[in-house]
Amino acid sequence: LNTFQLLKASLMEPKKQAAVRILAIGKIMRFVFLIILLLTIAAFVEFTIGLNSVSGDLDGLLLYIEEIEWLLYPLAFILLFVSTTLYHFIKISLFAWIGMAILKAMKRRGEYRHLWRTAALGVTVPTLLSFIIGFFAKNEWLPLLVSLVTLVYLYMAIKYYPKMPPQRK
């Protein structure tokens, strides 16, 4: 699967989300970093637009920012990328851990590494939706809604994991 096929699978194909458990981790990492890069670029553009639209009350600060602009923007972009990457990897890992509990409750076969790959695709749509909604409205319930949607995506994908073999007596 290429990156665009992974994006399509993350949008609407829970069966393929479950099937990515057997893909190489490198393909999943490339997909995750691409999503993080796109989110970082969009957030950085929002940051620079917001920085340029600061009111005239801060003339001294604006002058200082204009003087160090060549240093501020690259460092801000790198810091934003690193912090976004850390946040998303922690989020994917936590959802994979929760997915392990769902997996055991549904009596399905799988390992944490499989669920990490599935969770990496499962968080894509809710993350993109929350990012888009965040541009238009600020809502304190949005993180909870994103988490619930991610769990639904994860649950739908786990349904396609193989069942545990029956216990031998």
Label every PLM stretch briefly.
Residues 4-8, 15, 59-69, 113:
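Generic detector of well-ordered alpha-helical segments enriched in charged/polar residues
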Residues 45-84:
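Membrane-helix boundary elements
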Residues 42, 46-47, 78-98, 148:
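Hydrophobic alpha-helical segments embedded in or immediately adjacent to the lipid bilayer
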Residues 20-34, 60-71, 85-98, 160-168:
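Hydrophobic alpha-helical transmembrane segments
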Residues 33-44, 128-129, 141-145:
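Alpha-helix boundary/capping detector
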Residues 1-39, 169:
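N-terminal juxtamembrane cytosolic/stromal segments of multi-pass membrane proteins
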